[in-house]
Amino acid sequence: MAKYRDYLPQIDGDFFLTRGGLETTSVLQGNVDVSHCAAIELMKTDKGRARLRAYYAPYIDIARDAGAGFILEAPTWRANTDWGQRLGYTAASLSAANRAAIEMLHGMRIAQENRLPIVVSGSIVPLRDGCKEADEMHPCEAAQYH
């Protein structure tokens, strides 16, 4: 499942694209309401997962047409313990949601990998908001939290 775990092809200087603004696009253009701008919420339903696949597809096409690779970033930005609790997840259900998101992207990669290299990536926001300087964590605090 983890094709590039030990070697990331973008490190060699090849051109890779990634998505942009999943949460903003989902809310403003897709008319989708997700709690706390947490795109992981879209993983809860078939319709939400279909929206995610439809969101990623044009980006993959652009990368292919440009002769680039693609970094397929999971909808897991706000899928950490702090945000998960606000969203009503238990530790087990949050772990399952994160894993399901990555598994979905692996399926997308497998379907497209003959067309271009695709790296599946999952990011989780730091504790608190992560967008405010006051919310920054010391590296030791982050290591303990995550």
Predicted regions and their residues:
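Domain-level signal for soluble alpha/beta catalytic cores
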Residues: M1-H146
